[in-house]
Amino acid sequence: MSKTLYQKIYDSHVVCEDKNNTSILYIDLHLLHEVTSPQAFDSLRNKKRKVRQVNKTFATMDHNVSTQIKNINASGSMAKKQMEQLIKNCQEFNISLYDINNPNQGIVHVIAPEKGMTLPGMTIVCGDSHTSTHGAFGALSFGIGTSEVEHVLATQTLKQKRFKNMKIEIVGEIPKFVTAKDIILFIIGKLGSSSGTGYVIEFCGNVVKKMSMEERMTVCNMAIEMGAKSGLIAPDEITYEYLKNKMYSPYGIFWKNSLDYWRFLKSDSDAQFDKYFTIDISNLAPQITWGTNPDQVISINEKIPDYNKIDSLVKKDAAKSACKYMGLRSDTYLTNISIDRVFIGSCTNARIEDLRSASVILKNKKIANHVKAIVVPGSGLVKKQAEKEGLDKIFIDSGFEWRLPGCSMCLGMNKDRLNFQERCASHSNRNFEGRQGRGGRTH
């Protein structure tokens, strides 16, 4: 029977399944951070349970950490408490932790791929919605809640239902200055932020084949913004080259055996998908969101839509509300709107290729005096590599602050946040109301 990539990975991890297609799935890799794990560990203690597979469980500090100083006291009392609790839990249960003093510390969805923890064919979970990032390697990866974190810690399994299959084929030639982030934002805008609900999305096509692993991670990271369970891209030679000689990658005969298996991880040519879309990006321009939802997006050379001309009453009301919150008028260009902040970072766009691209644009230029801009590398290794290449100097010379790794301004959970009604051009994945701080306006 022909199968999709999703079906192949899912079926190979089923421990048992009932007549309603609800399965117990084996989990290959469990990633933890300081925010969604404390209650899970408390429950383990109360039930006198151990962590089932400590060698398949890794933790890092990222959401709450200060990006200005390596000190757990620097992000407030709640953040300090969560980080102290993570240290205690990892020590007690013998889990590897990349704390703020570890050179490998960083955003969980940046460090796992760069260390070779993320491998094709795996099932990967984390108490974070953008776990879909790891799907770029042909791994079935998705976010889970705190009670599910506890279940995986205790059993190394998870109760799951089967999702439907969606295929998005991206074709054409990538125009100059168009990035992977532009491509996925365009797709979200075209199909809608709920178009993926109930689906796992496989991205394919000649455009995807040409993408680097870091670009593929950006695409899969944003699959959740379509409402999808996860995003997937079949592994290929680009994947294998990226993984070769990583710390946790297979080696020797194990590498050869792994390659034999990984080459099987693709959808069969006659596999059936529940939905299929072909997206041509040949004429695409850089994209930017104007509203408070990722599908409220336009090309940089387009005007904000006139909500009075929108037929759908629901979409019209949403657009009107978004314009009010964002302090914008419809039928105007965003290029005429002044910004207060710039944020380069997040699990979507804080890898070395992202920093290289930004540095090319900023070299020998200065940002406006009134703009406060920060660059937050996705990990200690990204920061080290960027400094080796002199990228930090380019950013600093242009007026940016060069920060320590962390989630930073992606979410208003640490000291890096917008003030009321400040406007930010952001590399992050969400432009929800208040996402970067109360009353903050995110593009």
Curated annotation (Swiss-Prot):
Pathway: Amino-acid biosynthesis; L-leucine biosynthesis; L-leucine from 3-methyl-2-oxobutanoate: step 2/4
Assembly, per entry: Heterodimer of LeuC and LeuD.
HAMAP family, per the entry: LeuC_type1
Residues where [4Fe-4S] cluster binds: C347, C407, C410
Keywords in alphabetical order: 4Fe-4S, Amino-acid biosynthesis, Branched-chain amino acid biosynthesis, Iron, Iron-sulfur, Leucine biosynthesis, Lyase, Metal-binding, Plasmid
Name this protein carries in UniProt: 3-isopropylmalate dehydratase large subunit
Annotated CDD domains: IPMI
Cofactor detail note: Binds 1 [4Fe-4S] cluster per subunit.
NCBIfam families for the chain: leuC, PRK05478.1, PRK12466.1
Domain of life where this protein originates: Bacteria
Species, as recorded: Buchnera aphidicola subsp. Uroleucon obscurum
